[in-house]
Amino acid sequence: MRRAVDVPALVESARAGSPRAVARLISLVEDGHPALREVMAALAPHSGSAYVIGLTGSPGVGKSTSTTALLGAFRERGLRIGVLAVDPSSPFSGGALLGDRVRMQDHALDPEVYIRSMASRGHLGGLSWTTPQAIRVLDAAGCDVVLVETVGVGQSEVEIAGLADSSVVLLAPGMGDGIQAAKAGILEIGDVFVVNKSDRDGADATVRDLRHMISLGDRTEPGLWRPPVVKLSLIHI
C-alpha cells in the first residue's frame, strides 16, 4: 500500500527551496504515483518561467563536460540552476547510471543547484518519458534555467527540440557526426551547433561542412534563426 502524500505541503516545501521536497516530487513523477495528477495541478500555477536548454549529441562528444561548464557559467551570473541528466537505463534495475552526477560533483553542495539523473528506461527519443514533468517540478521550485542532457542523438532521438527553448547539438571532429547529423535530421532541430574537442585534427573541416549543410537547409529565409556553428575545447576552461 502506497503512503499518502500531502501534495500541497510538498509543493510548498519545494518552492521554499527544499531539495528533499524536489527529490520527492520527481520520484513521484518517475514512479507514476497515483497523486501525480494532483502534483502537476499544484505545480502549474508556479511554473512557466524557467528557460530550458537541451544538450544532445553522440556518446563521447562531451555532453556532460559541456553541461557542467554551462552550469558554472550560469551560477557566476547568480542564477538558480536545475540539471536533468538522462542516463541509459540499467539493464538490471531500470535505474539511472550516476556517471553524470559524479562529473558534476563540484556543484553538488551548492544550494542553488539541483542535479538529478533520470533513467531513460528504454524510452526512445533521448529522454525519459517523465522528463517534461520533472522540468515542471524544477521550474516551480524556482530554477531560472533547466539544463537537460539527453542520452544521445539519432533518428528517433529528437524530442528535446520540442521540449527545450533552445537545443544545443554537440559534435566532435573525426566521428562522422556531421554526416550523421544530416542523416538524422538533427540539422533541423539544433539552435546552436558546437564542435567540441576542437583541438583535434579535422575540427575546421567539421565546422565548414556543418555550415555548408545548414546553408542548404530550410532556415535561410530573412528573419529566421540561422544556427551558429562554434568551436569549443573544454580542456581550456
Q: For each predicted feature, which ranges?
A:
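Nucleotide-state-sensitive switch-loop elements of NTP-binding domains
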Residues: D6-R15, A23-A50, G72-S156, L163-L170, ...
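Hydrophobic anchor at the beta1->P-loop junction of P-loop NTPases
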Residues: I53-L55
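Walker A (P-loop) phosphate-binding loop of P-loop NTPases
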Residues: G60
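Conserved lysine of the Walker
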Residues: K63
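Hydrophobic positions on the alpha1 helix immediately C-terminal to the Walker A/P-loop
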Residues: S66
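Conserved catalytic-core segment of NTP-binding enzymes
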Residues: W129-A141, V151-P227
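Conserved small/polar residues in nucleotide/adenosyl-binding loops
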Residues: I235-I237
